[in-house]
Amino acid sequence: MDHRSVAIIPSSNLDASEAFYKRLGFEVVSDYGQYRILADHLGWHLHLTHVPGWPKNIEDNPFGLYLYVQDVDAVAARVSDLIIEKGAPHAKPWGTYEFAVSDPSGVLVRVGRILDQG
């Protein structure tokens, strides 16, 4: 088995969070009621756990995710109405092509790829 890391994201509304991540390309692979496991079958994995009242203030949510994908534009097209930065996706000074969205609990989700070094 390869090593991998999986984020466990708290959510006060699992149905809303599930719908959001499905738009990004995830699907539910296991549902335990208050705990759901999502994947895209290409390498992304995510666990959602129900935490009532989390976060108290959405803008105070300290969590973030970076989802690497080759076809950034295809994912952006599925969530274009949610993209935070106008004109995104675009190249960033730190060498990525990316965009950002916020999930229903305020988790910052960046979707991008590393630009060619050539």
How would you describe each model-predicted region?
Residues 8, 27-34, 90, 116-118:
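Conserved catalytic-core motifs of GNAT/GCN5-like acyltransferases
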Residues 27-60, 108-113:
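Conserved short beta-strand elements that form part of the metal-binding/catalytic scaffold
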Residues 1-16, 63-65, 112-118:
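N-terminal beta-strand motif that seeds the catalytic metal site of vicinal oxygen chelate
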Residues 12-15, 65-108:
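Vicinal oxygen chelate
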